[in-house]
């Protein structure tokens, strides 16, 4: 196996990758939840929410790939099973089918949780001067902050 030399010490790479694994698990869990709500939303806002949830889960699917590939670029294996994601994720899963208003509130909390995960990634990557991970986490944080704001506005 080739030695990786990207200017980040191994201990830092592993620490950063561990924080990215949590971000990956949170993102995948929110992706699944958003897709579920897209399929099962009902009510007077059905069309708007159905389309908005579709936009969101498509964006999350791309993010999952970017995060996993960043983990791999640090020479660490990315988690890829529901069992691993369940252990790592802080995004709260729900039982049953919530109302459309509850769906919006649940997804808002999920996006806010991921903002916090992005901040944790930044705390690990900034001292190591890992600009690639910093950029990824900052970009993801911006998307999730904006999405949470838009979701909150739906239920006002």
UniProtKB/Swiss-Prot annotation:
Q: What PROSITE patterns does this protein's entry cite?
A: DPS_1, DPS_2
Organism field = Synechocystis sp. (strain ATCC 27184 / PCC 6803 / Kazusa)
Membrane-crossing residue ranges in chain numbering: none
Alphabetically list the UniProt keywords: Oxidoreductase
The chemistry this enzyme catalyses reads: 2 Fe(2+) + H2O2 + 2 H(+) = 2 Fe(3+) + 2 H2O
Q: Which family does it belong to?
A: Belongs to the Dps family.
SUPFAM superfamilies, sorted: Ferritin-like
What are its E.C. numbers? 1.16.-.-
Protein name according to UniProt: Protein MrgA
Query: Which purpose does this protein serve, as stated in its record?
Result: Plays a role in transport of intracellular iron from its storage (probably in bacterioferritin) to its subsequent use in cofactor synthesis.
Q: Which GO terms describe its molecular function?
A: ferric iron binding; oxidoreductase activity, acting on metal ions
Q: Which Pfam families match?
A: Ferritin (PF00210)
Reported consequences of knocking out the gene? Very sensitive to H(2)O(2) but not methyl viologen in iron-replete conditions. In low iron conditions cells without mrgA survive 2.0 mM H(2)O(2) better. Cells grow at a much slower rate when transferred from 10 uM Fe medium to no iron medium. Cells have higher internal iron content than wild-type when grown in 10 uM Fe. Significant changes in transcript levels of 255 genes; about half are up and half are down-regulated. When combined with growth in iron-deficient medium 914 genes show differential expression.
